[in-house]
Amino acid sequence: MRRRVFSSQDWRASGWDGMGFFSRRTFCGRSGRSCRGQLVQVSRPEVSAGSLLLPAPQAEDHSSRILYPRPKSLLPKMMNADMDAVDAENQVELEEKTRLINQVLELQHTLEDLSARVDAVKEENLKLKSENQVLGQYIENLMSASSVFQTTDTKSKRK
């Protein structure tokens, strides 16, 4: 998060606070835009021997020049109500996500079971096909052998 600090020339955002600290208002957020301000205290710069020590400016009422956030007494009530609504909404969403995840897991297990069953049926089908082929050849051999016997039987009866 970027923090933009107003320069000391911005009389609305900075000034001496009367306790020896230089107050500077910073704004958090992208491109210097934000909805909340922070007050940063920076200690007074060291005075060199060649400079003059000027007295701290008199504390004046600059309240009309500085934008203050909403009164603190309203914030907790509004935030608690909003947070309760958000928490309830998040709880409902979390329960819905959990239900959907469980449903997906159950469907995955069912799909795995069906896939295993399909594989088993394919194996059984191949096994039965090979057995049918063997039985078919056996039947053909029996029929050809029986036809040989039938032809010999009819010839023997004719004699």
UniProtKB/Swiss-Prot annotation:
Tissues expressed in: Widely expressed with highest levels in brain, heart and skeletal muscle.
Name of the protein described by the UniProt record: Short coiled-coil protein
Function: Positive regulator of amino acid starvation-induced autophagy.
Organism phylogeny: Eukaryota, Metazoa, Chordata, Craniata, Vertebrata
Pfam families, alphabetized: DUF2205 (PF10224)
Major localization class: Golgi
InterPro entries: SCOC
Effect listed in the UniProt record for changing N132V: Causes tetramerization and loss of interaction with FEZ1
Alphabetized UniProt keyword annotations: Coiled coil, Cytoplasm, Golgi apparatus, Membrane
